[in-house]
């Protein structure tokens, strides 16, 4: 699987379709981030690198930073699931699906869900931040899924590059598929 991913990273998108240009609208994911990408992912990773997938805002429900409500809720509809933002709902659904499909395709990938929906201290054990930090420090690759590119305050879809490691070929491929942030 990693060799296949590397081949895809070298030739373009996994779908064989040209990537959506920055600022353009993808029919599935919406607008791509128009921000200029100022990095290149060149670091090669082990073919069996452990990948941790997390749902954005999974540990911040009911407090500042809980994710966007979404267009339907802003227009008066009820949230998709009581007690969580619509963004968090989709983050959970997609992060779990990514891990499940990745496992079916032979990737060393797992989904992480915090023990609580509200953890005020972002550095506390069990938060996405602390789990992702520890996972990458141990040599793994961590990815947090977000769907907050909605409305006038949204920037658009894209990969926010890692803060603590050199940019990798996985980062580069994800940026080609979904857009990139500087």
Predicted features along the sequence, with ranges:
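Solvent-exposed loop/turn segments at secondary-structure junctions
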Residues: 57-60, 115-119, 147-153, 165-166, ...
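A short, glycine/acidic-enriched catalytic loop
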Residues: 67-82, 148-178
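Active-site histidine-acidic residue metal-binding/catalytic motifs
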Residues: 32-131
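N-terminal secretory targeting signals
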Residues: 1-47
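Generic non-transmembrane alpha-helical segments
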Residues: 97, 101, 173-182
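Conserved acidic residues
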Residues: 139-140
